């Protein structure tokens, strides 16, 4: 599978976004001293899901799949902002 500039650029964007989203949720969990073993907590489940999603080998994915993965991380970015903000207000 050939690696093109466009593919490498897309992978770099995905990596930056995924790290940002994951770190936002991780910081929330740590700052609120949530039990990371308690899978009843939405934030902990989200953190676990994001951790698994980061394990995908992006260089093995076709460009079309990278675009879908990028959209997943955009959605998780918006979702994590919404739920973590709601938690702060509540």
Swiss-Prot record:
InterPro entries: Antitoxin_epsilon/PezA_dom_sf, Epsilon_PezA_dom. GO terms for biological process: negative regulation of cell killing; response to toxic substance. It comes from the Bacteria. Pfam families: Epsilon_antitox. Keywords: Plasmid, Toxin-antitoxin system. GO terms for molecular function: toxic substance binding. Gene3D superfamilies: 1.10.8.130. Antitoxin component of a type II toxin-antitoxin (TA) system. Neutralizes the toxic effect of cognate zeta toxin. Part of a postsegregational killing (PSK) system involved in the killing of plasmid-free cells. Continuous synthesis of the epsilon antitoxin is required to counteract the zeta toxin. In the presence of the zeta toxin, forms an inactive PezA(2)PezT(2) heterotetramer. Belongs to the epsilon antitoxin family. This is Antitoxin epsilon.
